[in-house]
Amino acid sequence: MTILNHTLGFPRVGLRRELKKAQESYWAGNSTREELLTVGRELRARHWDQQKQAGIDLLPVGDFAWYDHVLTTSLLLGNVPPRHQNKDGSVDIDTLFRIGRGRAPTGEPAAAAEMTKWFNTNYHYMVPEFVKGQQFKLTWTQLLEEVDEALALGHNVKPVLLGPVTYLWLGKVKGEQFDRLSLLNDILPVYQQVLAELAKRGIEWVQIDEPALVLELPQAWLDAYKPAYDALQGQVKLLLTTYFEGVTPNLDTITALPVQGLHVDLVHGKDDVAELHKRLPSDWLLSAGLINGRNVWRADLTEKYAQIKDIVGKRDLWVASSCSLLHSPIDLSVETRLDAEVKSWFAFALQKCHELALLRDALNSGDTAALAEWSAPIQARRHSTRVHNPAVEKRLAAITAQDSQRANVYEVRAEAQRARFKLPAWPTTTIGSFPQTTEIRTLRLDFKKGNLDANNYRTGIAEHIKQAIVEQERLGLDVLVHGEAERNDMVEYFGEHLDGFVFTQNGWVQSYGSRCVKPPIVIGDISRPAPITVEWAKYAQSLTDKPVKGMLTGPVTILCWSFPREDVSRETIAKQIALALRDEVADLEAAGIGIIQIDEPALREGLPLRRSDWDAYLQWGVEAFRINAAVAKDDTQIHTHMCYCEFNDIMDSIAALDADVITIETSRSDMELLESFEEFDYPNEIGPGVYDIHSPNVPSVEWIEALLKKAAKRIPAERLWVNPDCGLKTRGWPETRAALANMVQAAQNLRRG
């Protein structure tokens, strides 16, 4: 029984983000479709070759996507919303881009499909839309073409296909409501056709992804798996693939399926290998997801070997990444600025392929010398002074319940704040950032590259802050912001100023479409060596008599949008960040800043996949926010901002944050979101976003007034604020001025009654 290895998928964008550049060039009309397709072909060939050279036996094919793999599956099945269809009914790459972006070089623009998080990762997928009586047919043959490409290059191919039940689970019904699971029998013939085509090409194994099997699914959805896979059996061997959590709770459903193998995530799941071996049919192959596909740490391969060695020789076994390597940067070797010790702790996608080769060889031969050598740096890290800061650990251990409580309840604080700020009814403000113009970006880049000295850089930033204050005063806003000209990214900026983080040059991962992010990496205990935001907030406040908000990114969001440590809990990391930022709140307050906003857009998206795990997460997530904020005096007003759409199921936790003011994204839902706050009888102040900053459209005064009147039917007017949905960083100044002028006018009209 020779053990093989494989990956579940590989990053698509290219080491230098070649895919992003090709996409954006094509969208802008600067290159042809053929040039775009050529870049895709070259990237796929390179990535297959790189994996093969790194020692991977079975190469994933079908993991590449022009925008997103769920969207690719929609096209495969012929699921194209009517508004995005070509007039002749054909499907091409522009159809795909219209669904993803709302527009493409050809065809009529139409509202893009909804985008949401892929399970609990920072990757986003385009939500499939389903209508009653919908028809499906094999329409987009990208998978088959890529399999032909890989076979022609002589590769050992393992096609990757998103499974039918998970595909339906990820979608939403549009128009007349019905049970989308009822479409299962309509999509299965397309899957059968695809599997038949793969069998014709001599394919032995197909990786069929059903990550929904790690969720707490309704019984009807669990029951759907057996008939679905009864219909799909027989043409090729199916590797039922799960990830991001364990499968033990749904193992009875899984073991009844007519498949030939199961992939389990042994990094994020709590499945016991011996128990899995005992319960799986003896003729099934087990694919052990031992190498973390969604973090950047080198694996301790001696531990991984010990985890799996007892079942070697007892059943067919493959070793694999826990999930697709899509969530990891590509290649550590090009990072030239990382300290040698720190660099030795990391493994990016290509290094993870090498880890799989080392593990396969050791399991086949029994010789573990290479594993011990590879694991030495990560074992040495446990004792590194770069990791452990006794002062931070001592401070964390000393936290008491008192540290997460404001001195007084909201009613007492609100009175002190009213006396201090004397704001009018319907107070107006913005969420934080103003347009990041070419001048601002060039200024930061020149400083970063060393082409500009610190004095000239500071003079330039001060000028942009001054401009933002002047603009806001001219518009008549009540509570101002400094505009964040000095910040490139709301997480990276704080990470750069906190001890315990490092940054890469090329550690890009895909977020969606052509958007890539370069998350900071938490390498050790986190502390704040010096104030971060105080100087610029103080300068901005010196320019005006109106209150200027201090702007912080909250601890849970910094955690969720970084690569975390694996040797301590997420709770520990969040609370360390909270303590560091608590000192920032105290310093802002001492500098005369009376309103401080702590953004937590990621609080909800950090929720565990299983609802039974939610309470523990929300408890420490809320506590981290409160530790961050509770140092503030009664007359300091704490704001928070959240930009997502589902509050109903976490209202208790949102109220428990005890922020004096919460601003939320509501314009696209026509204030429907406020229902949750009304039903819950939310006690503090709320700023429902009155216009969508993601659109260049300028809302009219009447439209904003109507939304605010609607809001006032649900929330008492004396507790309402007036603000946009989100920060204005991506907008231009002309539409920003026009939209804010209308927003201020609407508030003034309401004050006059």
From Swiss-Prot:
UniProt-annotated binding residues for L-homocysteine: 431-433, 484, 599
One GO BP annotation of this record: methylation
Top EC group: transferase
Residues the record lists as binding Zn(2+): 641, 643, 665, 726
Keywords on record: Amino-acid biosynthesis, Metal-binding, Methionine biosynthesis, Methyltransferase, Repeat, Transferase, Zinc
One Pfam family hit: Meth_synt_2
Signal peptide: none
Active-site residues (renumbered): 694
Function: Catalyzes the transfer of a methyl group from 5-methyltetrahydrofolate to homocysteine resulting in methionine formation.
PANTHER family: 5-METHYLTETRAHYDROPTEROYLTRIGLUTAMATE--HOMOCYSTEINE METHYLTRANSFERASE
Protein name: 5-methyltetrahydropteroyltriglutamate--homocysteine methyltransferase
Native source species: Escherichia coli O9:H4 (strain HS)
Lineage per the UniProt record: Bacteria, Pseudomonadati, Pseudomonadota, Gammaproteobacteria, Enterobacterales
Name of the gene: metE
